[in-house]
């Protein structure tokens, strides 16, 4: 009987909590959205599966060595950790002390847990290498750069303003998060508000990179919100676009884009990086990888490297990035009031970014002979190329012969640049406070 009881107690099912059960259902929902609805499947599928692995009771796949020690509840070991932190020897007090401790002290406690025989789970290791170091989002950005054509942007430089205007959603969302905190509705610190705001850029890698730096505790919710809303762009944007434009404006036919020379395409990423990085060094990592990837594409002399970055490398990193995000979908971190606030602010951010891009296009039309179809302003959010396709689709509904796709790619690419710069601004000024 004792052996049978020990066997039963060793089953994960016996230790399944309500929070873990809910998160298992959330993870299954993400898998269903990825497989059945094809909502950003390249990221939501590994994120969902990572969420499943993270919430299997007793497996500890997403726990660091220190978290495994705390979950083990050994009184002697807790006393050693508590003595180092000068707090009461119980799990809750230790967690509070760790939250207030310096990163160097947290690292010392992690090493102490390793010395006591605990090891981090595989997903925790993935997270440390892929996101904790910031490497995975940067490599993804390199791949995106290698797949990006700056031609439409260079052919119509005014569209850069549309991409810039769409970033207004980012900063409006930061203010929204701080407003919720001010009125005591949902508690958000300034770094957390900045990390949430980047959802408005509709740029998954940038959202993961920034939240990993500013608010790693919210990374799971921010990543899920960012990629879910990116997949919902065809549903979120059209009503806003139609509400802000007239039938006549939607029928505007734009002048055919000029041919951009190879020299321009080669010089642009180099000049862009130098201008932005010299003014805002904190944007250099993201923008640097993006421009490097694009230079490999446009130079034409490293086709093997360009092909590897666009295909094999970005696919491999995407797998580990998704599983690493899934490591943050543990119940005690995800099932918080903050998650609801993130989901609400995320959709508002998308809406504001879309509206700002459309309104900027209308403003430019007031002082220009060559009219811009305001619909392409919505492509200023950097969901590439989905936002551009939505602009084209809504335009075709008003005029079946008015193809806006290539025109919309200009602000779409500008949005990627804008979100990277916005992330640099957040890092520079938020971390300095």
UniProtKB/Swiss-Prot annotation:
Among the GO biological process terms of this entry, one is: sodium ion transport
Q: How does it sit in the membrane?
A: Multi-pass membrane protein
Question: Which Pfam families does the annotation name?
Answer: OAD_beta (PF03977)
List membrane-spanning regions.
Answer: 16-36, 42-62, 122-142, 160-180, 216-236, 266-286, 311-331, 340-360, 413-433
Give one GO molecular function term. Answer: decarboxylation-driven active transmembrane transporter activity
The alphabetical list of record keywords is:
Cell membrane, Ion transport, Membrane, Sodium, Sodium transport, Translocase, Transmembrane, Transmembrane helix, Transport
- Which cofactor(s) are needed, names only? Na(+)
Reactions accelerated catalytically: oxaloacetate + 2 Na(+)(in) + H(+) = pyruvate + 2 Na(+)(out) + CO2
Q: Where in the cell is it found?
A: Cell membrane
Record carries keyword tRNA-binding: no
| Primary localization class, coarse | membrane
Disulphide bridges, residue numbers: none
Quaternary context:
Heterotrimer of an alpha, a beta and a gamma subunit.
**Which NCBIfam families does the record associate with it?**
Na_pump_decarbB, PRK15475.1, PRK15476.1, PRK15477.1
What this protein is reported to do is described as: Catalyzes the decarboxylation of oxaloacetate coupled to Na(+) translocation.
Protein name per UniProt = Oxaloacetate decarboxylase beta chain 1
Q: Which organism is it from?
A: Salmonella typhimurium (strain LT2 / SGSC1412 / ATCC 700720)
